[in-house]
């Protein structure tokens, strides 16, 4: 990617590159900063070696993410780059980062990325900048420039920012601030713009998508948003970060009634046992887990279910973990992500007693992965012999088509690998939907033959 200025403003001296760590919310922030700098005449380049300024957009959710962020910061400062640190680590450690790494030229908080051009201008003048709001309040709308890589054919669409929950293990409310939703009109406007750019799939994201609109409309309004988005000419609309409390009859009906909202439910349940959920400060969830999963399966038989889990939470006993394994076996999720509890300073769980040893936590993670691999393999093998609609995203070095069915979300799930008879114009397949016959499956991916472009 090399992004040239889209306007007639005089080119600035700095050539800027971005290094991104973390989730898709962070990625959207990066894309907005790229768009804002481009608007102001800066040359934004994906080749960090060619840049003299690197903006490292960091993650501070867990320790491993912080370590990766620090590695990148040090890598670029050691190369003599002028480094600006953005994102969650800047928000989290706004008073410590520049003291510990004095080579850093500037900090930008999670609610301040719209100021990137002004921050860079000050850095160019030799100033050390700390632009971090105490409480993040900003959320970009469709009017804020954004660079979207159209070669990926998929774009994330942020519908809200921040979180009003206080889960015991999670530091996100401190890093991202309180929930603030965009209007339905703003979101639909951006979706239409993405459709005009050739985007084939949009993925709705926020900290809790099912709480969308509570702050501005006085009640959760995801169902109304989905009904409006279903009118936008984008083939696939996917939703991430849905919570059981928000999967109302109206929301489920919107999934059923809309042709372009794919029946893919990303439900970060974290655990199944009531005792553990209570310790996580999610006591409301235990009674809902069973009923909402059964309801989704009953109402939408083609539904794909994904969840994320935490093992090794303080106080998690053997019987709690066995309850979790039984829960997985009973509900047979299509996809599961599992993480070991990471104690975070500033969260309620940091000081909880009855810590689970790292060895036990690691073994439990491996156990969950093993159980889920068997389930996922059975799920995937059930598609063998069927025809599926596949979005082709790239061409492999072996001249195979690499894509996804609606069953797979990008980055976190598997892929579909397809052979094709006519290899002359393979590039014509990129960004297109094809019909494919599935002939083989393993626990992660599907394999088959391309039948035709749809």
UniProtKB/Swiss-Prot annotation:
MTTase N-terminal domain mapped to chain residues: 14-125
Cofactor note: Binds 2 [4Fe-4S] clusters. One cluster is coordinated with 3 cysteines and an exchangeable S-adenosyl-L-methionine.
Residues noted as binding [4Fe-4S] cluster 1 in the record, renumbered to the chain: 23, 59, 88
GO molecular function, one term: metal ion binding
Organism encoding this protein: Prochlorococcus marinus (strain MIT 9215)
Domain TRAM positions: 381-452
UniProt domain Radical SAM core: residue ranges: 149-378
Any one GO cellular component localisation term in the record: cytosol
Cofactor: [4Fe-4S] cluster
Main localization, broad class: cytoplasm
Native organism taxonomy: Bacteria, Bacillati, Cyanobacteriota, Cyanophyceae, Synechococcales
Lineage top rank: taxon: Bacteria
Keywords assigned by UniProt, alphabetized: 4Fe-4S, Cytoplasm, Iron, Iron-sulfur, Metal-binding, S-adenosyl-L-methionine, Transferase
Primary role: Catalyzes the methylthiolation of an aspartic acid residue of ribosomal protein uS12.
Subcellular location: Cytoplasm
Entry's Gene Ontology BP terms: tRNA modification
Chain sites annotated for binding [4Fe-4S] cluster 2: 163, 167, 170
SUPFAM superfamilies reported in the protein's UniProt record: Radical SAM enzymes
EC number: 2.8.4.4
Family: Belongs to the methylthiotransferase family. RimO subfamily.
Catalytic reactions of this protein: L-aspartate(89)-[ribosomal protein uS12]-hydrogen + (sulfur carrier)-SH + AH2 + 2 S-adenosyl-L-methionine = 3-methylsulfanyl-L-aspartate(89)-[ribosomal protein uS12]-hydrogen + (sulfur carrier)-H + 5'-deoxyadenosine + L-methionine + A + S-adenosyl-L-homocysteine + 2 H(+)
PANTHER family named in the record: RIBOSOMAL PROTEIN S12 METHYLTHIOTRANSFERASE RIMO, RIBOSOMAL PROTEIN US12 METHYLTHIOTRANSFERASE RIMO
Name listed for the protein in its UniProt record: Ribosomal protein uS12 methylthiotransferase RimO
InterPro entries (UniProt xref): Elp3/MiaA/NifB-like_rSAM, Methylthiotransferase, Methylthiotransferase_CS, Methylthiotransferase_N, Methylthiotransferase_N_sf, NA-bd_OB-fold, Ribosomal_uS12_MeSTrfase_RimO, rSAM
